[in-house]
Amino acid sequence: MRVPVFEDIKDETEEEKIGEEENEEDQVFYKPVIEDLSMELARKCTELISDIRYKEEFKKSKDKCTFVTDSPMLNHVKNIGAFISEAKYKGTIKADLSNSLYKRMPATIDSVFAGEVTQLQSEVAYKQKHDAAKGFSDYAHMKEPPEVKHAMEVNKHQSNISYRKDVQDTHTYSAELDRPDIKMATQISKIISNAEYKKGQGIMNKEPAVIGRPDFEHAVEASKLSSQIKYKEKFDNEMKDKKHHYNPLESASFRQNQLAATLASNVKYKKDIQNMHDPVSDLPNLLFLDHVLKASKMLSGREYKKLFEENKGMYHFDADAVEHLHHKGNAVLQSQVKYKEEYEKNKGKPMLEFVETPSYQASKEAQKMQSEKVYKEDFEKEIKGRSSLDLDKTPEFLHVKYITNLLREKEYKKDLENEIKGKGMELNSEVLDIQRAKRASEMASEKEYKKDLESIIKGKGMQAGTDTLEMQHAKKAAEIASEKDYKRDLETEIKGKGMQVSTDTLDVQRAKKASEMASQKQYKKDLENEIKGKGMQVSMDIPDILRAKRTSEIYSQRKYKDEAEKMLSNYSTIADTPEIQRIKTTQQNISAVFYKKEVGAGTAVKDSPEIERVKKNQQNISSVKYKEEIKHATAISDPPELKRVKENQKNISNLQYKEQNYKATPVSMTPEIERVRRNQEQLSAVKYKGELQRGTAISDPPELKRAKENQKNISNVYYRGQLGRATTLSVTPEMERVKKNQENISSVKYTQDHKQMKGRPSLILDTPAMRHVKEAQNHISMVKYHEDFEKTKGRGFTPVVDDPVTERVRKNTQVVSDAAYKGVHPHIVEMDRRPGIIVDLKVWRTDPGSIFDLDPLEDNIQSRSLHMLSEKASHYRRHWSRSHSSSTFGTGLGDDRSEISEIYPSFSCCSEVTRPSDEGAPVLPGAYQQSHSQGYGYMHQTSVSSMRSMQHSPNLRTYRAMYDYSAQDEDEVSFRDGDYIVNVQPIDDGWMYGTVQRTGRTGMLPANYIEFVN
């Protein structure tokens, strides 16, 4: 291990030597200090003081530091620190040893001369030893370990020079199945061909339990909705019969004006091309492109003269004519630019006052895409603090989805073992059923290719002639880079700013031709100077380029099949010789149709142990691989299973690939091999390196970040294409729903994050934000809801007849639920109306110490009424005690109350929860009256002092507050959570009367806010 301190120490010693050589004549040797008792005492005191200060600093910094457990990295740092401290200690010891007593003596002539001679001799000996040992290092004699050998081989494979050399070497093909180039071509074709992958998946997985699943059907519908082609087809079908009877865009004058504006916009665009981003093209500088460019230059003069002769007699129309202005106004109203402006105004975004150039718009969009602050603001506004009510985001739903995936994999493997392997079947390509399936898939794929050719290639203006793939690619790239952007610039730069364009003049045509030739030349020049010369990599992931690549592949496959059919008709059938069988096997392995089947099926030789092992591994990881291929389009990282499989395949097959390459048998160059070779030459090293970077777990280095930023800033076509595709249609609710569903479908990311976070606690501060998050999580959690749902599932409910007791319980439940969940208290509205109801209501009551005992006017009436009420109350207590002792506890409360109310009409029953009458509460029957007209009871009170006189009763209950409550009226009391309420007396179903022990206040309080304390 290299310790950087050694170099520092060496530098320090060298500096000391240089300083000593410079100051040898000026040195003064001091006398050593004699160590006596005072020096020893001072040394010990210094050590004690330093120890005390160290402990004080340790105590002060104790609260500022966080102690963590010893991780491997921390132990490594400790060991390095120990080595560094030991090296420094040895360095100081050597420096002290060099200052010996002999050296402190005065320098004499002999000592100085001896020192110089010794130094010269040491330098000469050092140089001789260095020259003798030059070229003999320890590394040259060491054996090369396997790790170093493997690292060197990986480095060679990753280098660009070695890669190109290996590409040339692998152009000789053999009949082996596991060659790296064949596997890479197969993998890339599968990744690019999404439609073929889905078709192959549908052919292989024919189980109704897999195909008919709701999530699969939902994913298919989501892909159809998100497809722009399907959206345009649906729009055309719906709007076919809704066109306007008069379309000003189809008039001759408007078309002429539009053509002139297009040509003028081309001139304007080419004129300002130096002020904007330099255009970038990923087309290679091929010989036939140069030939085409030179030919176009030679023909441009002739074409220019021909068009000049044809346009001699044409006249120019007036741009300010009434008809032209009318068409221009209609075009502005119908244009997409107007809709976008109205959409931006409706969104509330202010329009900038200065002119927005295309370069400024591209820079602004790039800043928005790269800005992390915008994402955080959207997160704060839209997500943070809002409770999620979607069922798809609950932990239970994610867990169920994860278990479903596991069960599906298990079921798939189980069916494979039971139906195929368990019945002794061999997956051989020569079985009649497999041959028939192959033939059917070939016919279906051929039909699909023709359909794609008609709809994608011919329907979009491309010519499916005998041109090569490079020519088609160049044509498509030219269309993308010119027509689409020029038309958009026409709408935004010229028409939107009220500019008037002249007609199709001679100068405009000449400028158009010259700009086209200059643009092609400028693109190639910028490509060589700006991109290739600076080591930048051209991105192949542009949607337009991907679509062009897809088109070229479809056409190449169709052309290949046509050539194969022509070749079949030119040959006669002969007996298969070993050479022909070997060539057939090679063609089957290279064929694109064979890639859609399982790798290894249809071999004409006996399977070796290595091939059987590869087959079993592919069968075991097939279900995971298919799912992971879908996830290549998502923004999530590779799961651990896929990473492990990739690493295993790389580690296992490195040596095997080389051996198979050496065992390759050269064959003649067939048309299939020629086509494969051309396709491999077109696949650049950028694609492979990009895939390697996506597979590594390191962050992007500064050079890669700079290259990415430069690519984004330089590529003007890319930004314009992205902006155009992002604003061609408005965001419909279906599109938003599809986006949300696609984000919610993938549960692998959430489960992986959950597994990684499991068992890794971290100490964080208990901030108010964290408390808020905890409370929100507790409220959002539906675990309790699902638990209760599972308990009551299938039990059903028994309908009962509504009686007064059930009605009262239902209303109480409604009050409690409103108060607990919604924060709505229905009794507040009734309390606001209570003072008006209580006015002028008088109820006769008396108690010891009541004011009524001193009133001479009402004494007789009060005495008679209270005497009758007291007799009824005593009789009621005796009757209830006898009925309670003779009956069981299960008697309904509604029946008891009905009987009591029939016998004693003047009594009013209280809540069954408190039962104050059986405990002898001092509430007389006439003290309160209950009204059931509105479902809530009203308390008619006449004297507060008479209520306070009842606090001395020894049998009153004590309650504790469960929530905070603020008094809404004068006769109510306020309390907090945890307060004790004494002398509680029930009034009706929803209200009680009591005294708060903490404040000493007495008044009414809600019954659902307190709980009984034994």
UniProtKB/Swiss-Prot annotation:
Instruction: Provide the SH3 domain boundaries.
Output: 954-1014
Q: Where is this region: Disordered?
A: 1-24
Keyword Repeat applies: yes
The ranges of the Nebulin repeats are 29-63, 64-99, 100-136, 137-172, 173-205, 206-241, 242-278, 279-313, 314-348, 349-385, 386-422, 423-459, 460-496, 497-533, 534-569, 570-599, 600-635, 636-666, 667-693, 694-728, 729-759, 760-794, 795-830
The annotated region (Linker) lies at: 836-953
Using the record's annotations, give every residue carrying the modification Omega-N-methylarginine: 795
| Molecular function as annotated in GO | actin filament binding; cytoskeletal protein binding; filamin binding; structural constituent of muscle; tropomyosin binding
Name listed for the protein in its UniProt record: Nebulette
The encoding gene: NEBL
